[in-house]
Amino acid sequence: MLKEKTSDVSMTNTNQGSGTAAEAAVPMSHGLWNTWRKNLLLFCLTGVYVELCLHLCVFGSMDRYAGYPVLFGLLGGALCTLVVSSLPKVLRQITGVFLVAAQVLLAEVQLVYHCIFGDFMPVSQIGMGGNVVVNFNSQLLYGIRQNLLKILLLLLPLIVVILCLALRRGQALKLRLRWKQTMASFAVLLALLLTVTGLMYVGRDNAFSVYRTFTNVNTSTDSSYKKIGMLATTAQELRYMLFSGSGSIMITPSSLNMSDVPRTYSSNSYNVIESIDFTALADSTDSDILKATDEYLSNATPTRKNNYTGLLKDYNLITICAESFCPWFISEELTPTLYKLSHTGILFENYYGTFQSVTTNGEYTMCMGLYPDMSRTKTDSSFNVAGTNYLPFCLGNALKGMGYQAWGYHDYIGDFYNRNITHANMGYTFKAADSGLAMKIDWPSSDLEMMEASVDDYINSGEPFHAYYMTFSGHYQYNWDNAMSAKNRDAVKDLPYSEPVKAYIACNLELEYALEYLMQRLEEAGVADKTCIVLTNDHYPYGLTEDEYNELAGQTLDTTFEKYRNSFICYVPGLSENIVVDEYCSTADILPTLLNLFGVDYDSRLLAGTDVLSSGLHVAVLSDKSFLTKAFRYDAGKETVIPADENTTVSGKLAEAYRLYVDSRFQLSGNILNSDYYAHVFARESSGGSLADTVVFTDIKSIFNQASVLYMYRKGYVEPEAPDTFGGKATARLGEFVDVLYRIAGRPETDNTALPADYENEEFNAAHPYYNAVCWAYQTRLLRQNDPNTEYDDKVDYQTACVLIRRYAIMAGVDTGVDQTQLRQLLRDAPDLGREAAKAMLWCDEKDITTRDSSLDELLASAGTRISRYQMTSFLFYLCTYELDIGS
């Protein structure tokens, strides 16, 4: 007897005959295939819509690369269809909505991030998200408000998918039909994949082709988003991060700066360290990345020493990386100090800031003379990776070796971007607004207050000094909510500009006032005539729109090159006449130029930048690897060569040689960073070139949480729960809280006479690790018998933490007064809160000890919420640095 072929659809109606059921199965099966086709169309259109919408929202128009985001959007849609086709009914609908929601959410995040920072966020920086929310929450809300319509447009496909999938009445499919639909989805995906691969492969030989963009590990996130879109970029970054281990290490040489065979150079004529033998170094290592770098540098040509070598060897040096600085607001009337600095000394007429956004990239390049790692394999910012590397050429370390004091300052929190680690490693005694500088933290903070709080550290020391400043007053947003813009509003009220441009100028006036104060103090100390001041920007002021920036500049600037034109101010008093330099240069060239001017022994082959005052090759390099020379400009985005004038002819061979040279600068920088190359060259013990070496505890993942924990741990104030685990998520206990305060106090002698009766027992006695701390706490009345929490094992909430912190501050002689009007209002609004607790929470909020960029109402609402060990550590870290001034 033959077995009948079963239907792909479960049939449950037993009132119909077998013939009727068989007839019904066919149209029902067709209907289910129609549903599959609709799903395929829905997911593919969603992928295309999200890609095109994001592209248009960010770039403003379509270009010749827009077709590839469309194709990858189709691929993403086919992949979604493949995933949901293999799932049962309910799970199929839930998964479909989830996949689209994830796609839309990523696009929304990138849109807002681009609005705030001017570029796209790499997957490797997703861990910074929490820090952005905490430290940039007002900017985050501003970005959302500015892009609300675009955000709603990006939400449309999610709404459509929810309506089409979640509200659609699905039918159960037998495994056989699910398998067929899965195979059909796979076939569509494969066809699209072959099509896209074929199209990319056709143009693979072009240096900046879509194929190279997609496959090259060193492709930047911005370039990738523009050429291949969000989905493909995210997929590639995830693939390299999760499965690829390391990126490219080979450096392709250019004929412009390489000799055919290794040569020996004399330090009398060249900026080299003669003891370095790159060939011998290559033979001494088994590391592929070290060997590749050694072999490349063995043929590299160094820069020549020149008439300016050692010109400033008797000078002090102050370097300033100025937040969002540009030269267009400088005038003799409005900014006389900046005007004087920019017109006296060495004048660089063709300087370009390399970066569109991200302070840490510009700051890193200025300080290191190297480009940051912008490849897909990076897992952290380059500054953080360099935080454990050997860095002999950073100005702090280099000048300290010549007898200079070296100080570093920033007028925001010190653990942001881990500056308390990275800048100390560059040789600076580092202070920030929350760690060592007596100044107010604001958004943004005052450059003038930073200067006032720091100058006395070095100006009257009688020793040569180098001071480095990372400013903050020029940070966006440019409106009257900006603290520095509001402060200086009257000074710009009559200027003929729009409000954002006025606000930009107003907040940058704080830098002018800081420099005015600095010059005054230098004069008073009698060292003004022997102090060189260098200033440049970290990045383009992305907080201004293109039209607003043109308004400020008084001209229409092209967005590929001229918007990056900026200032490398090198103020040198005492020269008989200004030195005018017309060579093209950019951020990475500042360090080698200063090393040469100050007569530092360095090897120019070990830096990506070039001494601008030397003879030879000079290029202004931008972050997307576009560049400018005297003869021509190269637009990497469009892959076009633009001659300097109509009489200049640029051969393809010459353009390619320059392109390879620029590419080699980035690859060399990445190799030096990721291998701790200087440690290899100078036979120092290598740290491995990873921030992981500085992370003591595996459960403290965020680089922005590490600083407070490591600070408190290294000071001996807190103990981890295990050698490699801090235990930050565990609930804080009263005994440990007072023990940390006891350690901060210096572990004074104490006894048990103040302990409440019956407090000691079998579990808590003189052998207990918190015994002395609890005895001390009761003896000093830090703990009191009528407190809500008195037992050493009690869990600590926000209210208790605030009370203990304020009590300790009073013991330490800190002014803990609060506004009485605000206190009375608080007691009326929160009648259940005791007077002491109200004072404590109000004071802790005002001093930003327990809250950061959040309101008092939020703190009060959390009064009874228990805090974690990490929160305890963070609060007490801010007590130490904000109020007790215990240096970092």
Where are these regions (language model features)?
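Solvent-exposed soluble domains appended to multi-pass membrane proteins
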Residues: 286-694
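Intrinsically disordered, low-complexity repeat and linker tracts
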Residues: 1, 7-25, 250-300, 678-717, ...
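Transmembrane and membrane-interface helices of multi-pass
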Residues: 2-4, 21, 25-268
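Generic recognition of well-ordered alpha-helical segments
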Residues: 104, 131, 589, 593-597, ...
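Membrane/wall-proximal cationic-aromatic binding patches
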Residues: 217-319, 324-339
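Sec-exported extracytoplasmic/periplasmic mature domains
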Residues: 342-346, 371-372, 400-404, 459-460, ...
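Feature responds to low-complexity, polar/acidic, surface-exposed segments characteristic
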Residues: 687-706, 715, 719-738, 742-771, ...
